[in-house]
Each structure stands twice: as C-alpha cells, then as structure tokens.
Amino acid sequence: MNVTELVVFIIYFVFMVGIGIYFFAKSKGDNEKDYFLGGRQMGPWVSALSAGASDMSAWVLMGLPASVYALGMGQIWIAVGLAIGYALSWIFEAPRLRKFSIAAGDSITIPQYLTNRFLSKSKFLQIICAVIFLVAYAIYAASSIKACGTLFSTVIGIDATVAMYIAAFIIIAYTFLGGFNAVCWTDFFQGLLMLAALLIAPIFALALVKNGGAVAGAAPVVEGYWDAFTSWSDIISGLGWGLGYFGMPHIIIRFMSIRSNKDLRKSSVIGISWTFIILIFSVASGLIGRMFLGEISDSSVVFITMVRTIFPAVVSGILLSAILAAAMSTCDSQLLASASAFASDVYKPVFRKNASDKEMLWAGRIVVFIIAVIALLIAANPNSGTIMGLVENAWGVFGAAFGPVILLSLFWRRFTFGGAVAGIVVGALVDVLWLVFLKGTGVYEIIPGFFAGLLAAVIATTAGKAPSKEVEALYDTAVAMKD
C-alpha cells in the first residue's frame, strides 16, 4: 500500500463530499426543478465541463487506452465517432432542446419533455422511459464503480470489492445531499483534473521513450497493430458510437440546464474543445503505453501503470485521482438522471399526484441510493464483464432508444406521440436482440437499433393521425423562441 497516494485519494474524497454538503446546506426551500436541473442557472464553463465529465467516464482513462494498447489503431474509430457525435449534438441538438424543454411545460426530465412535447395526458411514455433509465443506468453506473475498485486494488492493494463499496458510498453521499448543483460543480472540478492527467502522463512518457528511457521497449504487437483500416466492421462500429450522444439523457439534460442561448454557444465551444483533447490523449495513452511499458498482464491498468512508473507518489496520487474523477462524475449524473426519471415520471404521476416538492426530493434521493446499490452488486459480480463492455451495452440502449426520437421531436413538426413510443420501444428492442443474437457480426448494436428506431418512429407517425393544432403551435413557439 502506498500511504501517500492513499492520503491524496482521501483528501479528494473529502473535497467531493464537502461540495455535496455545501449545496445541501443551501438547499432549504429548493424545489424539484432546483434539485434535478439546477434551476436552469448553469453557466457556460460549468455546463460544458459537467456535460463532458459526465460523458467521459473511467473508460476514457482505462477502457479506451486498454483497447488501443491491446488491439491497435483500429480502435481510434471509437474516438473519431464520439468526437463527431459530440460536436453535432452541441451544434444541432443543444440549442433546440433547451428551447423545446421550456416550451413543453418547462420540462425537467427527458421523459417528461417527450410527454409534454405532444401535450399528452398519457403517462405511458414516461413510464417506459423511466424503466429503461433504471435498468440501463444501473449497468452503466456499475462500470464506474468497477473502475474505482480496479484503481484501489491496483494502487493501494485493498480488495477490489471493498474499494467498490467505499466509492459507491462517496458517490451516494454527495449526489444524495446536493442534487444537480453538487453534481455539476463536482463534475466541473473533475473535468479539469481529467484533462490535466491525460495531457501530462502521455507527454512525459513519450519524452522518456524518445530519450531512451522506456521501461521495456516496444512490445510485440498483433498483425496490423499500426493500421487503422484493417477492419471495416471496426470502422463502422467505432463511428456508430457517435450516435449515442443524441439520446444520452445524463448528457443532454445539461443542455436543458443552461441559463441562456448565449451561454449555450460558449458552452459548446468549451465542451467540444475539451472532449476533442480528452479523446486524442486517451488514444495516445494507449499507443504510447505500448511503447513505454512493453507487455503488461492487464491492459486495463496501462494508464495507471504508466503514471506510477513516471511520477513520484504525490503527483501520481493527484493524477490517478482523475480516474476517480472520471468514474464519479459519470456515476453521479447517472444516479441523478435515474432519480429524476422515477420521481418526476413514475412516483408523482402514478402514485402521488399531489406530492409536494419536499416529498419529490426525498423520493429522488431514495432512488439514488437504490440504483447505486444495484450498480454495486453488478460491479462486484466477477461475471459482469469489462468496464468497456458495460459502458458499451448501456450506451447502445440509450442511443438506439432515445436518439432518433429526441431528434425527430426537435426537427419534425408532424412527429407524433405514437411515433415516439414506437421509436423508443423498437430501438431498445432491436439493440438488445442484436446484442444477444448477432454480436458475432462485429457490428455494434447501436447502429441497427438506432436506424430501426428511426424507421419505426417515421412509419408510426405517417401511418397515424396528424398532430393537433395545439401540438404544432407548441413546435412553432419553441422554434421561434429567442432565448
């Protein structure tokens, strides 16, 4: 056990919980909108880095470098697809989603927005969305908790399962207490730390390699390791990752929280720039790690091993806290999205129509705890798969189910409630069926799921009744909204 690194981790944890306590102390009188959406008062820097940090979970420091380290340049297409998708979501989706969510009854969750967008009195769509949220987010959050366990077991030497319990407790604490404000502000600081770690570590490692300081020299590599064009299925699947951004609730909800369209434009520049840099240096960490470290037994710890080899304990502790930052910043956002979906889209409309704001806040907090426990149990299961695999599965479901429907709701005036239901159900179903039965094709399930959902939404809309004049008027109002 390295005591210095442990002390750095403890200080980091205390800082994160302190933010949660601060916003809990300020929350007297807060309502549902404040807890789940920050009162739509997020500034450009906090919004941008919070969206980025909640997106780039521990896989960007462990999963992606590990894939690149083990399999080579063909894995860069994941980064390319994500960069393109992220930029497009900020440029085209963010401005409209912010305005449409306000026009649609000042909606504070994605399921609520979709229901209000069509002025529907039915809660069927909200309930379907909430169920998908709870299941998929439990899997997604498990990847973050698993990453924390891997980090602690590698660096400090404690049991991975014990480490997962500790990480889950910290994440629950500040999310439970502080809500959206705490999540966004912790994500802001964690985004800065992730950026610093990914800039510093590979640059120092490359400098040592060039100066003859490599630990083991370049390790034997698989055939075509340095060729990015060896497999068309890798290229298509990698680019397909970008489709996920259009339907990723815990990311696009940041678009709804921004103060104004002016701030949103600033946020887009900051957010896109941050993400591009993060992805470039994540890939670089895998490639440079191959040259610097040679062959290591567990590719998932390539970034950890590189940092600990180069830097003294105090510096490595700070840089490795970036993995905690990545894991926690994503997990907290997923827990909050699950909580808001249940409290606003199931608990109030189905069970307690007259629930007070205080009751809604506590319903959400209880769900934060329950989903975190489920995610912890998944992560602690040795058969749950890799960090990257868990992320891939959850990412695919969200992108396929919600991406086409969100886009159509923002850009197609004639789009209907029935089309939205069909798109979500078919998209999610095709994604899961492809994962179970056709994964051997090498094509990422989000691609057939996304386009099947898109086709189903279009067919159901054109085959059904046109939307009412009131629904069309809502669309026109949102489009015309200045700020």
Model-derived features: where do they sit?
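Membrane-embedded helix-loop-helix hairpins and adjacent transmembrane boundary segments
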Residues: M1-D483
